[in-house]
Amino acid sequence: MSVYSNPAAARVKRGFTLIELLVVIAIIAVLIALLLPAVQQAREAARRSQCRNNLKQIGLALHNYHESFGTFPPGNVHAIVDTTFDTAGKAGYGWGAFILPQLEQGALFNQLGVNNKELHNLLKTAALRPLTQISVNVFRCPTDTAPTLNDQKIFTNNAYGDTAAATASYAGVHGTRWSWASDWLLNKEDPFCMFWPDSKVRIVDITDGTSNTFMVGERNWDFNSAIWIGVRNYQGNGENGLRQNQGIANWKINLPGTNAPRAFHSGHVGGAHFLFADGRVQFISESIHFDNTLAVPGDPRSMLGTYQRLAMRNDGALTSEY
């Protein structure tokens, strides 16, 4: 008697057991854990590269401005007091606004009226205030998580209300002391830095050498970032006004604390990018030699660290390796 066989039954495939499935899931999890940091590092490397390119474009724009006008732009314009408006809150355009044409933002430059209208006058007109809130990509580091509008850098005035300006990730280098700017305004003393109110620094004024002088550095949202348009009244608000688009090297890179909004810092691990006066961009380690213990007011040639020396253009001191 013949035995009937079922070919279909013989072809039934064996499935995964629960243990095998768990092993496969574990292998996939391990691969993800190994690959994810590499992917994140690659993305951050791309962001750092874009940040560096942004600063290179800013450097080229600053030098093109110098080529056209014989000086670098002012850190900010010292606005004329308008007593018919009020006696405080005089906002002034900053270095970022002055180089808009060199950054292919000529239309925005003309709409703002940078050459013929003071910023505080523009802010009086409600219809024109949104111009200060336009984000310019070259002023934004892709690692910086800042929102489009910087609500930590607000133009405050009873006459035109509160206006939050567009965020920037870069600040002009104002040396190592805010008071150098006020010293210059009062006594016309040289503040030793690249940017200050009404500054007109020429390349020949950078006697320490353009390759040894910071011009622009990073400012991260974790410490309130910056704005590109300019500053609010720095005479009434002191350094709180100037630090809107300028920074000083009196505190360490990426150092948290109450003084951080005055300093330089980035979202990159280990340091921050700086644009030098010769146009090159270099990543400066947060462990760079730092010493501000003997920064005697009125005597910028006193003993300072390498970091502080790089923030001054004509202190006459040799700069060590960094």
Where do the PLM segments sit?
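Generic alpha-helix initiation/capping and coil-helix boundary signal
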Residues: 1, 19-22, 35, 158-161, ...
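Internal low-complexity, small-residue/proline-rich segments
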Residues: 41-322
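N-terminal single-pass transmembrane signal-anchor helix
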Residues: 12-47, 57
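Residue-level detector of intrinsically disordered, flexible termini
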Residues: 2, 7-11, 25, 37, ...
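Amphipathic, alpha-helical segments enriched in basic
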Residues: 6, 26, 30-33, 37-40, ...
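N-terminal leader/signal peptides at the extreme start of proteins
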Residues: 1-18, 79-82
